[in-house]
């Protein structure tokens, strides 16, 4: 397919505004109150949305990252999309899913996915970042397992302190969109 990244980004923005953004009174996972909510799952669990996110994230991955990971459930479709598209592009980056709690049976592990060597570089993916709490939990679990987290990539940064929380850990945050991008698009339509 001969699609420009700018066109893919615009298409994803339109999908997010149509299918993920909701106005109203909400309590976020951080406990904060908000006048809007962004649920990316209707987008990232659709075939086209998964493709768009996967392509755009794959283009941003550092060459040294051998895997992508994220906290279940929001990051599950993200890591799978990037991993599958990486294989099609000849890059073969593994997908890791980080559990919120250790599995209560079998291996009792926090991380599901193919085994990687100690020191393997992993990029954490997140759908929506507010304070960064969910992604930081994934970062901690990955570091405890002996992996090196090089950065966090998000779909939407709500600009609620997440970037500062990652910076305090020495981990860069990059996002496909800021909340201001969604607001500007919604104001135009």
From Swiss-Prot:
The EC number on file is: 2.4.2.10
Q: Which SUPFAM superfamilies match?
A: PRTase-like
Q: Does the keyword Glycosyltransferase apply?
A: yes
Residues noted as binding orotate in the record, renumbered to the chain:
130, 158
- Entry's Gene Ontology BP terms: 'de novo' UMP biosynthetic process; pyrimidine nucleobase biosynthetic process
* InterPro entries named in the record: OPRT, Or_phspho_trans_dom, PRibTrfase_dom, PRTase-like
Pathway involvement of the protein, from the record: Pyrimidine metabolism; UMP biosynthesis via de novo pathway; UMP from orotate: step 1/2
The catalytic activity, as recorded, is:
orotidine 5'-phosphate + diphosphate = orotate + 5-phospho-alpha-D-ribose 1-diphosphate
Indicate whether DNA-binding appears among the record's keywords. Answer: no
MF annotations from Gene Ontology: magnesium ion binding; orotate phosphoribosyltransferase activity
Q: Which domain of life is it from?
A: Bacteria
> Which keywords does this Swiss-Prot/TrEMBL entry list?
Glycosyltransferase, Magnesium, Pyrimidine biosynthesis, Transferase
What are the required cofactors? Mg(2+)
List positions binding 5-phospho-alpha-D-ribose 1-diphosphate. Answer: 99-100, 103, 105, 126-134
Q: Which family does it belong to?
A: Belongs to the purine/pyrimidine phosphoribosyltransferase family. PyrE subfamily.
Subunit comment: Homodimer.
What's the stated role of this polypeptide?
Catalyzes the transfer of a ribosyl phosphate group from 5-phosphoribose 1-diphosphate to orotate, leading to the formation of orotidine monophosphate (OMP).
Name the NCBIfam families for this protein: pyrE
Q: What is this protein called?
A: Orotate phosphoribosyltransferase
Gene name as annotated = pyrE
